């Protein structure tokens, strides 16, 4: 997609080299799609935060679509995603991608719910902890990815065991 529409560039570095490289940035990015965001390292930092926000947005879409998929209304999720792309406050390129995935596989039955992470979310959480900045939405999104990679969760087994032990609640064996 970047090759077709250009790349959003978050450039960090000293002013002189950035000015010298401006023609390259302008060529690679769509109109208003690049910015000098600060000194050395600032570009990577802004990209890290960008990717953390992306994790959170995807998690929100995933949870909302799961709720609709489990509703009693037999909703056409691809149609709803398309609808939301026209004038809704939640419209985005990620929603366009969701609509495409739902058109191809309306209940996502061809996929496993295994979600990898590439590290940016971890780095952002570590930085947030260091700076005493709460990032609960991102933390939930990252931890949900971790959970998606477990075939059996020891924590969930422990919860079942504890509920059974203190209240006689049913367990599955």
Please give the residue ranges for each predicted region.
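Helical "substrate-binding/catalytic lid" subdomain
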Residues: 6, 10, 20, 41-169
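Phosphate/pyrophosphate-binding betaalpha-module
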Residues: 16-27
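A common structural junction motif
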Residues: 28-32
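Active-site phosphate/pyrophosphate-binding segments
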Residues: 34-37
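Long, positively charged, glycine-interspersed low-complexity recognition regions
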Residues: 172-173
């Amino acid at each position: 997609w970047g090759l077709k529409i250009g790349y959003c560039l978050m450039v960090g570095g000293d002013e002189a080299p950035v000015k010298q490289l401006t023609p390259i940035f302008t060529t690679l990015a769509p109109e208003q799609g690049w910015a000098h965001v600060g000194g050395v390292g600032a570009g990577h930092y802004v990209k890290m935060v960008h990717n953390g926000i992306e994790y959170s947005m995807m998690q929100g879409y995933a949870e909302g679509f799961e709720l609709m998929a489990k509703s009693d209304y037999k909703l056409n999720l691809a149609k709803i995603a398309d609808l939301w792309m026209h004038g809704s406050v939640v419209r985005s390129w990620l929603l366009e991608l969701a609509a495409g995935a739902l058109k191809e596989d309306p209940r996502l039955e061809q996929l496993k719910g295994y979600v990898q992470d590439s590290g940016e979310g971890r780095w952002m959480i570590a930085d947030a902890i260091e700076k005493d900045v709460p990032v609960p939405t991102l933390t939930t999104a990252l931890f949900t990815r971790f959970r998606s990679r477990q075939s059996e969760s020891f924590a969930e087994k422990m919860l079942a065991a504890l509920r059974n032990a203190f209240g006689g609640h049913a367990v599955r064996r």
